[in-house]
Amino acid sequence: MKIKKKYCGHVIIVGKANVGKSTLLNNIIGKKISIVSRKKNTTQSNITGIKTEDNYQSIYIDTPGVVFDKNNNQMKHHKNNFYQTTQIATLIIFIIDRIDWTIHDEIILNEIKKTKIPILIIINKIDKISNKIILLPFINFLKKKIDFIEILPISAKKISNLILLKNIIKSYLPENCHIYPECYVTTNSDFFTVSEIIREQLILFLGDELPSIIKVEIESFKKKEKIALYIKAIIWVKNVRQKSIVIGHNGEKIKKISMISRNNIEKKFYIKTHLVLWVKDKN
């Protein structure tokens, strides 16, 4: 019996904040493993997604959106770590927002070019481009920048060109043993998953009222056999003012955040959940 060759590699997803990296990752994996919102820098840590199809295993790393200093357009290294993640990369997916090429895209491209790793550029949100004729001149403009392995216009939200994208990625995976079992879709811990579910609701309910640096700490996570899940979490904010914003008038806002978070946790883990949230300030 002939043994099938196996292929496996790491694919790093990079780009400015809010260009659709997490949406793309979720659609490639086929499950929501990274929270999504219109707020910039929703993703605060590397999110790993795993897609195994037959003898191919792609390990995707969704990096936080690259942040720039407003004064000098320099990358803020302490908030972005794709320099480290590219060390293990087989392929880099560089996502840009429609045909909006900025100095920040240029800076990111110059950095990832230094890695000598193959780069696939994705022009995302093409569903928002009414006149598609302008795409071709823009693609020609990009081709002059570097010899990309492919320039692919897509709509991550509407999953256009997803099969083509997956096939391109597979063609660059090296022959390797699979690192994770076939059933794995992420390396995120249960603690991390729960904290992200809560943080997503905070972002949705609070919008721009609070900075994206808000932190959710899981204080306890206990499962009573297969009957129920008991979770206590602390929402850390900067000061008393922010604390009152999160809690809301008569506690209405935090009640809604808690209720929807609990429902989403139950859907994720298929178990009845008891969730207690505390809001604390660091002062």
Swiss-Prot record:
It comes from the Bacteria. Residues 7-175 form the Era-type G domain. GO terms for biological process: ribosomal small subunit assembly. Residues 15-22 are annotated as: G1. One of its GO terms (molecular function) is ribosomal small subunit binding. PROSITE patterns: G_ERA, KH_TYPE_2. Gene3D superfamilies: 3.30.300.20, P-loop containing nucleotide triphosphate hydrolases. It is found in: Cytoplasm; Cell membrane. Residues 124-127 are annotated as: G4. Residues 41-45 are annotated as: G2. SUPFAM superfamilies: P-loop containing nucleoside triphosphate hydrolases, Prokaryotic type KH domain (KH-domain type II). Keywords: Cell membrane, Cytoplasm, GTP-binding, Membrane, Nucleotide-binding, Ribosome biogenesis, RNA-binding, rRNA-binding. The keyword Nucleotide-binding applies. Residues 154-156 are annotated as: G5. It is a peripheral membrane protein. An essential GTPase that binds both GDP and GTP, with rapid nucleotide exchange. Plays a role in 16S rRNA processing and 30S ribosomal subunit biogenesis and possibly also in cell cycle regulation and energy metabolism. NCBIfam families: era, PRK00089.1, small_GTP. Belongs to the TRAFAC class TrmE-Era-EngA-EngB-Septin-like GTPase superfamily. Era GTPase family. This is GTPase Era. It comes from Buchnera aphidicola subsp. Acyrthosiphon pisum (strain Tuc7). The lineage of its organism: Bacteria, Pseudomonadati, Pseudomonadota, Gammaproteobacteria, Enterobacterales.
